[in-house]
Amino acid sequence: MSMQTAPIKKTTLNHLQAKKNQEKIIAITAYDALFAQIFDPLVDVILVGDSLNMSFFNQNDTLSASVEMMLYHTKAVCAGAKTPFIITDMPFGSYKDEKTALKNAIRVYKETQASAIKLEGGKEKAKLVKTLTDEGVIVVGHIGLMPQFVRLDGGYKIKGKNEEQQKKLLEDALSLEEAGVGLLVLEGITTPIAQKITQKIKIPTIGIGSGKDCDGQILVWSDMLGFFDSFKPKFVREYLKGKELVQNAIKQYADDVKKGNFPNELESYH
């Protein structure tokens, strides 16, 4: 009699929403199958972020990321990670109106195994969110510092420093929740208003640079593993000197090749 392995339990939106006020949600970015497979057993959520345009393609911002790019990398991540809840960023310009947003969101669902899509914007996106959720698409919201608005904002600026911004952020969060977003990313928001939003809404918040009171946290993997030393945001904690470790390994490899120590007899065929 053949032994059957237990089916892999995929993290769902219900699982994540059940963690609200109970257990912190662990999220990280990934852009390929290799790292997705490494992260798989350790995280609840993987975001295929348009941040790949900066960390993977060395561009200055996220704005030139395309739908095709996001689909390609989402397919790779889904091939490597089987259990986390996988979110695909909708890139700049891909949800400019309801027709365009529906077309691109449906492509994500048809062409990948992504669990949800994420879009940036506040209460002005509420109608769009409802349209998408009415079609069966799980939408993750994103407010605060929104990278797709970096040129309009004149840079990456922390939000929630004054009463007007705080009021808008809370209104945005409540409107998006009512419209049907399943999770809400809070980026670059001052801690007090991030805490207030987290307390006021019933869906989980996932913070990045928004203090410890959010229901979960997310970081760009190459930031937290120390692969970029040219610029490190205040909110990033490095858990590894990845760039240094990799460079040292390559140096050892190069040295072995130059000295004729690689390959040796055990690494050769006869």
Curated annotation (Swiss-Prot):
BP term (GO), one: pantothenate biosynthetic process
Chemical reaction(s) catalysed: 3-methyl-2-oxobutanoate + (6R)-5,10-methylene-5,6,7,8-tetrahydrofolate + H2O = 2-dehydropantoate + (6S)-5,6,7,8-tetrahydrofolate
Sorted alphabetically, which Gene3D superfamilies does this protein's record hold? Answer: Phosphoenolpyruvate-binding domains (3.20.20.60)
Question: Per UniProt, where does Mg(2+) bind?
Answer: D50, D89, E120
Q: Where is the active site?
A: E187 (proton acceptor)
- Kindly list the places in or outside the cell where this protein is found, as annotated in its UniProt entry: Cytoplasm
UniProt-recorded Gene Ontology molecular function terms: 3-methyl-2-oxobutanoate hydroxymethyltransferase activity; magnesium ion binding
Zinc in keyword set: no
Binding locations of 3-methyl-2-oxobutanoate: D50, S51, D89, K118
Main subcellular location: cytoplasm
Which Pfam families does the UniProt record give? Pantoate_transf
Q: List all disulphide bridges recorded for this chain.
A: none
Catalytic activity, EC: 2.1.2.11
The protein's name in its UniProt record: 3-methyl-2-oxobutanoate hydroxymethyltransferase
